[in-house]
Swiss-Prot record:
This is Putative lipid scramblase CLPTM1. Disulfide bonds: none annotated. Glycans are attached at residues 117, 159, 239, 293, 411. Residues 1-47, 599-631 are annotated as: Disordered. It is a multi-pass membrane protein. Residues 1-352, 410-414, 497-500 are extracellular. Involved in GABAergic but not glutamatergic transmission. Binds and traps GABAA receptors in the endoplasmic reticulum (ER). Modulates postsynaptic GABAergic transmission, and therefore inhibitory neurotransmission, by reducing the plasma membrane expression of these receptors. Altered GABAergic signaling is one among many causes of cleft palate. Might function as a lipid scramblase, translocating lipids in membranes from one leaflet to the other one. Its main location: membrane. Belongs to the CLPTM1 family. Residues 374-388, 436-475, 522-631 are cytoplasmic. Residues 622-631 have a biased composition (Basic and acidic residues). The lineage of its organism: Eukaryota, Metazoa, Chordata, Craniata, Vertebrata. Signal peptide: none annotated. The keyword Transmembrane helix applies.
Length: 631
């Protein structure tokens, strides 16, 4: 179970849009046509976990819910800028239903287009489109398609931009304002879109620390030296859909809910709004983008015009909305390209019933996570005795959380993941104060200035046999862990490239904990075996975590996942089944007195019989010390 948390962190930590020194694109980088291919092992590690995909879907559902809540608001408040605070008047669509339209599509390197007489820049001209018509077109669904290859200029090869300017005009009109009698402002809808997409490619300069050699592509090293560690590269996708929303809602200026307000354009004079034009590239997978470079002679472009209903437009607008966490800084909470692709592929390829079941189960999974966290805090907060509990496992958990935090900081993971791991580390530190006596020694200061922290085992841990069994368990465990740790360190040093010695230490420790961290759960099993008791364990928390592990098992084999993640789920199951077996063979004796001096029989007597008024209750017979030891 602890190993799964580090695995999920690893999935997040590699999604930074980086390129490793061997020239392979990392999680945020798309595959290049004719360029170097990604390492298969790296591709396997980059696949996001099931819950990253599911949580991405749930986050989008939340955005959709927020938008729909805006539609359920009351009437708009009066605008103080209007005379006497009069309420704003609802507007209408400037293009009525079934309006005949002409479509003009111009391709230019200029963001502001004025050269309407240049026929070479007219990419597509489509006459007699019917606004809101769903039965015409090439396939009888209201859609029209056009394909053509664009000549690639030298400026575009050198990271220049390509813009598409589209104009919808009522039939018989022209988009050129200079054509008197053929142009009308209220009969022309204009929208501009940059066709190429700029992606950041970060070069990680790594090498073998012993030999100093690297498997990096010499071309990548040369580009890194000339452009720096971060390079902005123009990418291209050959498909784009132009949607005109079939909507005649009486929108009120200033009251359109976000993110829809970005697309509804009002005329300043009449107050009415233009038809909503939406460039739909949602189903363009990031892996299908390829870089624009000197090897390309032309760029293929397939444009599709389709009508779009209001509710589907709301869904797309919510999907493309900027994250509310952007105020924390760029890329704070933005999903990586592969995370976004995983959500889309799940929607496209997953059976609808399975997808619905996945969403429901993921909600249950989140509830179990919260309940496990709550019961874990309650257990340690109210715990009076440490008898039967492995204190060393708690201390090792702090070390493990610290390594994970330093690792994700070294790999520049996004801010939200860093905060979540840091909070987990603080909770682990808090557990230390519950299992050990922590105090400040102001007499023996460090360098005579800083008070020294003193850690001392609690008496309930030292005076019982638990400490002996705990030390014995970690002694046996060290016989296995130290050789494995040494072998893994040598392997990482010989065969894996690193940025430096500090990164090697962190990645080596992190990889070792990810692979063998589950072994640290076994000392508690040994203590249970020696004490012949499991009554001291936080069973509620363990049960919730086990249920989550079983859910992970189910979807790890249903959803495409890395094999190491599947193995991690299964090995955690093995440990928990051993816990269940111990609970079955070491049944709780109701006559056994716990650390509070009460037993199950006492509670049953208290509930069935109450002493009479003025009668002194019978004293509780103290159990022998040998019987208390197992509680």
């Amino acid at each position: 179970m602890a190993a799964q948390e580090t695995q999920a962190t690893q999935q997040s930590s590699v999604s930074n849009g980086e390129v490793s020194s061997n020239g392979a694109a990392a999680s945020g980088q798309v595959a290049q046509t004719g360029a170097t291919a990604q390492d298969p092992q790296q591709q396997q590690q980059q696949q996001p976990s099931a819950w990253q995909v599911i949580k991405g879907v749930l986050f989008r559902i939340f955005i959709i819910w927020a938008i729909s809540s805006w539609f359920r608001r009351g009437p708009s408040t009066p605008d103080p800028n209007t005379p006497a605070g009069a309420p704003r008047v609802p507007s209408r669509n400037l293009f009525p239903k079934d309006t005949l339209m002409d479509l003009y599509v111009y391709i230019s390197q200029s963001e502001i287009f004025t050269d309407f007489n240049n026929t070479e820049e007219l990419f597509w001209y489509q006459q007699d489109l019917v606004y809101g018509e769903w039965t015409t077109g090439d396939s009888g669904d209201g859609c029209y398609e056009y394909y053509k290859e664009l000549d690639l200029s030298e400026s575009v090869k050198q990271n220049g931009s390509i813009y598409m300017h589209i104009y919808f005009t009522k039939s018989g009109f022209h988009p050129d304002p200079k054509r008197k009698g053929q142009y009308r402002r209220l009969s022309t809808v204009h929208a501009t879109r940059m066709l190429n997409k700029y992606k950041r490619r970060k070069f990680l300069k790594t090498k073998n620390l012993l030999t100093g050699e690297t498997e990096a592509d010499p071309e990548m090293i040369k580009r890194a030296e000339s452009h720096g560690p971060v390079e902005i590269i123009s990418h291209w996708h050959p498909n784009l859909t132009i949607n005109m929303v079939d909507d005649h809602t009486a929108w009120v200026k200033g009251s359109v809910p976000p993110p829809l307000d970005q697309h509804v354009k009002f005329d300043a004079v009449s107050g009415d709004y233009y038809p909503i034009v939406y460039f739909n590239d949602y189903w363009n997978l990031q892996k299908d983008y390829y870089p624009i470079n000197d090897t390309l002679l032309n760029l293929p472009l397939r444009l599709t015009y389709c009508p779009l209903s209001l509710w589907r437009w709301q869904l797309y607008a919510a999907q493309s909305a900027r994250s509310p966490w952007n105020f924390l800084g760029e890329d704070t909470y933005e999903q990586s390209d592969e995370d976004q692709d995983s959500v889309k592929v799940a929607l496209l390829e997953t059976n609808p019933y399975l997808l619905g079941l996945t969403i429901v189960v993921s909600i249950v999974h989140s509830i179990f996570e919260f309940l496990a966290f709550k019961n874990d805090i309650q257990f340690w907060n109210s715990r009076q005795s440490l008898e039967g509990l492995s204190v060393r496992s708690i201390i090792f958990g702090v070390f493990q959380s610290l390594v994970v935090l330093l690792y994700i900081l070294d790999n520049e993971t996004n801010f939200v993941v860093q905060v979540s791991v840091f909070i987990g580390l603080l909770i682990d530190f808090w557990k230390i104060t519950k299992v050990m006596d922590v105090r400040l020694d102001r007499e023996n200061r460090i360098a005579g200035i800083v008070p020294r922290l003193v850690f001392k085992d609690k008496s309930t841990y030292v005076e019982s046999s638990t400490k002996i069994y705990d030390d014995m368990a970690f002694k046996y465990l060290s016989w296995l862990l130290y050789p494995l740790f040494g072998c893994y360190a040598v392997y990482s040093l010989l065969y894996v490239e690193h940025k430096g010695w500090y990164s090697w230490v962190l990645s080596m420790l992190y990889g070792f904990l990810l692979t063998f961290g589950f072994i640290t759960m076994t000392p508690q099993l040994f203590i249970n075996y020696k004490m012949k008791s499991v009554a001291h364990l936080p069973w509620r928390m363990l049960t919730y975590k086990a249920l989550n592990t079983f859910i992970d098992d189910l979807f790890a084999f249903v959803i495409k996942m890395p094999m190491m993640y599947r193995i991690g789920c299964l090995r955690d199951d093995v440990v928990f089944f051993i816990y269940l077996y111990q609970r079955w063979i070491y049944r709780v004796d109701p006559n056994r007195v716990n650390e509070f001096g009460t037993s199950g029989v006492d509670h049953s007597k208290d509930s069935s019989a109450q002493p009479a008024a003025g009668e002194t209750p019978a004293a509780i017979t103290e159990k022998p010390e040998g019987e208390k030891k197992n509680d």
